[in-house]
Amino acid sequence: MDTKKYKNITRGVSDTYVNVHPIQRGGVLTAEARKALLEFGDGYSVCDYCFEARVDLVENPPVHDLVQDVAEFLNMDDVRFTAGCRHAKWAAMHMVCEPGDTVVVDALAHYTSYLAAEANKLNIVEVPHNGYPTFEVDIEGYARKFEEVEQKTGKLLSMAVLTHVDYRYGNVADAEKVGNICKEYGVPFLLNTAYSSGIMPVDGKKLHVYFLCGSGHKSWAASAPIGILATTYEWTSKVFNKSTLRGDWSGRGFTKKEIALFGCSPVFGAPVATLMASFPAVVERVKHWDEEVEKARYFVGELEKIEGFHQMGVKPKQHTLMNIESLPLHEIAEKDKRRGYFLYHELKKRKIVGLHPGMSKNFKINTYGLKWEQVKYVASAFKDIARENGIKVED
């Protein structure tokens, strides 16, 4: 066994590069979080003063205060930190639904929404989207699916899941409308905010959300893995239900431990410390979401000056994550010895990273948090690559 390769690992990308990775922009650490990462990087480092047997109750560092402040920030009543947004979805389904129940999801849902349902032995029914080129989810379809499920099974489904911002096209779904439909039918509503809360304003109660799931490492400037599960007072005791099991021989019990969180949320060190350190900046940055959307729209406008380039998804952009169709580049890549890696290497030569290697027919990109000059630089780089390869570009 050669273990030398594990030492001194690096990403191979310096701070001088512009990172446009679609799932990393909202998770870029603040300076305060980088400091906290070093301070709390050792294992269970936030548990030095744990007296209540749960990380969410730790007072020093102020994790318990953070729980309350995050709940207030999201306009929800109670919060727990989880091992990613996927764990939050699994936990809510596990505590609310029964095996064999049906949940409705949008057809753009992240794969982990499906796996969370499957792990809980639930059935899935999808609300469709309208296909190419906008891929817009049929929000009114939630009501139709509710009625179809009730007619087929004789009972209402046990949960409705909506992806607030999908990971493929960056479409922003009308969560408030789905929330109203769920309220009318009496169906518990889970909103996946992995790409929204933490970078844009999200008000859980305004949206009639019962369970709000977020991603600290995707959108709250935290190191991975950490998720957020927020709920209302009506559901707190059910979702965060405590253990009642006792050993038949020892009599041991763990009555403070919450079942769906495996007793204590597995975010004990760097994840919760970096989330905490970045939180003041997160609270501030959502106030500037309009400017982030403005940058995204500018970027789309510049790239669509390239012949054959089109933004897929709903227009105009409401979010910074976007999917660009780029068929002329794909045709060039087919003849280039680098094949699909052509675009990746051309951008890296210009110190731009984050596009998935091998993609040229279309690509996902995210401008969130970039300075205006960086947005303009990346747009210019694409136009330069196009011109160098004989693709027409509008002046």
Where is each model-derived feature located?
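N-terminal "arm"/small-domain region of PLP-dependent enzymes with the aminotransferase-like
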Residues: M1-A53, L261, G369
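PLP-dependent enzyme catalytic core of the Aspartate aminotransferase-like
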Residues: M1, E147-E148, K152-K155, E284, ...
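PLP-dependent aminotransferase-like
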Residues: E98-L156
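Conserved PLP-binding catalytic core of the aspartate aminotransferase-like
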Residues: V293, R297, F309-E346, G369-K371
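Conserved N-terminal alpha-helix of the aminotransferase class I/II PLP-enzyme fold
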Residues: A33-A36, F40-M95
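Active-site C-terminal subdomain of aminotransferase-like
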Residues: G216-Q318
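Active-site phosphate-binding strand-loop segment of PLP-dependent enzymes
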Residues: F135-G198
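Conserved active-site segment immediately N-terminal to the catalytic lysine
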Residues: D203-H217
